[in-house]
Amino acid sequence: MAVGKRIYLKRKMPDHEVMMQFKEIPASNVADVMERSCAMNPRIRLVSSPKAQMMVGPALTIKARSGDNLALHAAIDMAQEGDVLVVSNEGDNTRALMGEIMMALLYHTKKAAGIILDGPIRDIDEIGKWDFP
C-alpha cells in the first residue's frame, strides 16, 4: 500500500549560533562547498520585496503533489518562528499550492523566516509588497 503523506513530528534542530553564521554567507558559496547538492533551481525567483533578501532558519521540508496542498497546510500548522519552509511541487506549474491567505498565516501568525516554493502561487501582486522572503 502506498503512503500518501508522511509527517515527521520530531525535528532535530540545528545549533542557533552556527545557523546564524550562515546569514552572512552567499548561497552560491554554500552550494559550491556542498558540491552543488543544495543549489536551488534557477527558475525559482524572489516574488516579494523584503528589505533583506537573505533568510536563514531550520528547514521544514514539504513534498506536495500538483494541486494538493494538504501537506503544506500540515506544515504551516507545524511551523515555528524562524522556520524556512521548502516546498517541492515537483516543478509543476499548472496549479498554485498557496496564495495570500496561507502566506499571511505563515508570515504574520507563525513568523516564519521565509518560504521557497518550486511552483506557482496566487495573489502575487499583494504578496510582492510584503517584507517576507
Question: Where is each model-derived feature located?
Answer:
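Feature captures the catalytic cores and cofactor-binding loops of soluble hydro-lyases/lyases
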Residues: 2-133
